[in-house]
Swiss-Prot record:
Name of a matching Pfam family: YidD
Cellular location(s): Cell inner membrane
Designated name of the protein: Putative membrane protein insertion efficiency factor
Chief subcellular location: membrane
Species of provenance: Cereibacter sphaeroides (strain ATCC 17025 / ATH 2.4.3) (Rhodobacter sphaeroides)
Described function: Could be involved in insertion of integral membrane proteins into the membrane.
Keywords of this entry: Cell inner membrane, Cell membrane, Membrane
Disulfide bond residue pairs: none
Membrane topology listed for this record: Peripheral membrane protein
């Protein structure tokens, strides 16, 4: 992971360490948003990974979607599937 991506990952790691145990398991997606964010930063770097993580977090709300949503590029079968 690049140094900038490591800096972007700090708030995610802090959330997982400090807030997640108190908030509980409320993520609508699998993998969870924090796992998704760390994986996106690892695979795609700070800019694209940060953008993917921000989009995912903005989609995670009661009126948003749910279900299996891996990081693009992580699952070739997922990348070929049409979105709709």
């Amino acid at each position: 992971m690049s140094p900038l991506a490591q800096i972007f990952a700090l708030p995610v790691r802090a959330y997982r360490l400090l807030l997640s145990p108190w908030v509980g398991h409320g993520c609508r997606y699998q993998p969870t948003c924090s796992v998704y964010a760390l994986e996106a930063l690892e695979r795609h770097g700070a800019l694209k990974g940060g953008w993917l993580a921000a989009r995912r977090i903005l989609r995670c709300h009661p009126w948003g979607g749910s279900g299996y949503d891996p990081v693009p590029g992580a699952d070739p079968e997922h990348d070929r599937r049409p979105r709709g």
